[in-house]
A protein has these predicted regions:
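A post-motif C-terminal structural segment
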Residues: 1-41, 90-436
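Sequence-pattern detector for short linear motifs
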Residues: 30, 55-56
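Glycine-rich oxoanion-binding loops at beta->alpha junctions
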Residues: 52
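Mobile, glycine-rich extracellular loop/lid and propeptide segments
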Residues: 1, 43-49, 57, 63-94, ...
């Protein structure tokens, strides 16, 4: 897509050409398929654990994270994401909890540890109960200014962070203007960031892209002559996969790839830095596929399918919001065409209006099942035009790439478990790795 539509090579490909490439297995303890908590815990601690655990063993014992090791060595530390900052992946690097759902406990630990840079979404978790996002920040209406706190107590974590020396920001322009010699807390949306398709410059959301956050985090952390650890996550890639939203998956990966470019440029100028690029798991079981049209042949896809994906201008999340509570089939056809330039039939609109569980693998364990089923129905309809196949609405156990560049990056080559990533990072700090 990047080569044929954007006419440019991915930054990840550029890193692969001059760095090293390996494959990572993601299986957790006790199960065949992982979640982000277990996988991120394996990467951050070098220890496999069970589903939902945050940097704790199966028995509930804290496991030391690479961020804590860095902090103990006097290095600066940072967590950057496009999800809530308390979400599973950043949580597994900066906290310990029996469940990824313990968001308030996780945030308390972030501040107690003094993590130097914290940027992402989820300001609702930082504000006293019954308070409005817009009263605590400059977050835009599109990014959730009218939303209310998720807390059940009167704790004001933003004020507590400021007392601990953090500068709090909530808009892209504030991020650009923020000095580099500070501890930085950036919360740019009420919950997760809007999808990349819905936060383009022209949307005026005030939400920065991942590359801009990466550049600022590197400037802040690099002031420490003793070095730093930084975890950067394109977390909404996973959510787009859960929704079976091919165009959003592409847009989120491209947003992440811009951040890779920023990190790669930094590392090329710093010969003592290790850059690792990977994923905690795959989502959706997706790929381009051919379609059997008739007994005389099959359609193996073409540039036109990629062009169709490129014409989708909004995520499924925005599309289903525009449907409203009780859309007619004409409403659905109109909204789909508005955002995709694809004309769907009345029967296809009916399929979207009355969505069903598409398969046993299109999971039901969501709080808002109706939205998820609707997204999967849209994904199934558009898949015919995009020639994209989806096997599930959940995670898969497909191995993921591990790309390395810089100091100790030769160690990424080969096939390894995700817990091995911890060893590579620890050795890059000049520490020995001893396995019992």
């Amino acid at each position: 897509y990047s080569l044929l539509i954007k006419r440019r090579e991915l930054n990840m490909e550029r890193v692969i050409k001059v760095g090293h490439l390996g494959l990572i297995l993601t299986r957790p303890l006790l199960n065949l398929v992982t979640d982000s908590a277990a996988s991120a815990t394996a990467m951050s601690t070098g220890k496999r654990t069970v589903i939902n655990r945050i940097a704790k063993s199966k028995q509930g014992k804290d496991q030391e994270t690479i961020l804590e090791i860095a902090k103990g060595m006097g290095k600066s530390t940072g967590l950057v994401t496009t999800t809530r900052i308390s979400d599973a992946t950043p949580a597994a690097f900066g906290s310990h909890s029996l469940s990824r759902e313990n968001r308030f406990e996780i945030l308390d630990q972030f501040l107690e540890k003094g993590i130097d840079v914290l940027m992402g979404g989820g300001i609702q978790d930082w504000m006293p109960k019954k308070t409005r996002v817009g009263d605590f920040s400059k977050i835009s209406l599109k990014a959730g200014a009218e939303k209310f706190s998720k807390r059940k107590d009167k704790k004001n974590l933003i004020k507590e962070a400021e007392k601990r020396g953090y500068q709090f920001i909530s808009q892209e322009d504030e991020l650009i203007k923020a000095p580099d010699d500070i501890k930085l807390l950036g919360l740019f949306s009420s919950s997760h960031f809007l999808m990349a398709l819905d936060r383009k410059k022209s949307d005026h959301t005030g939400i920065p892209n991942l590359a801009l956050m990466t550049e600022k985090a590197l400037k802040v952390l690099d002031r420490n002559e003793g070095g730093f650890f930084l975890m950067i996550e394109g977390g909404r890639i996973d959510h787009a996969g859960h929704n079976n939203d091919a165009a959003s998956v592409v847009a989120e990966i491209l947003d992440f790839d811009e951040a890779v470019g920023a990190a790669f440029q930094f590392c090329k100028e710093k010969k003592d830095t290790l850059l690792l690029i990977t994923s905690d798991h795959t989502t959706g079981g997706t790929g381009l596929s051919y379609i059997v049209r008739n007994k005389w042949g099959s359609d193996f896809g073409s540039l036109e399918n990629l062009k169709a994906i490129s014409r989708q201008g909004a995520s499924f999340e925005k599309i289903w919001e525009e449907f409203g509570q009780k859309p007619t089939t004409d409403d659905i056809k109109r909204v789909i065409y508005k955002h995709t330039k694809i004309k769907i039939s009345k029967s296809e609109a009916e399929f979207i209006k009355n969505p069903i569980l598409l398969s046993p693998f299109h999971v039901t364990a969501y709080k808002n099942k109706k939205k998820v089923y609707t997204a999967h129905a849209i994904g199934r309809i558009l898949a015919k035009r995009y020639q994209v196949s989806w096997s599930t609405g959940g995670h898969t156990n497909i191995p993921v790439m591990l790309i390395g560049y810089g100091i100790n990056s030769r160690k990424v080559a080969g096939l390894n478990e995700n817990r091995y990533i911890f060893d590579v990072m620890k050795e890059a700090f000049g520490l020995s790795v001893i396995h019992p």
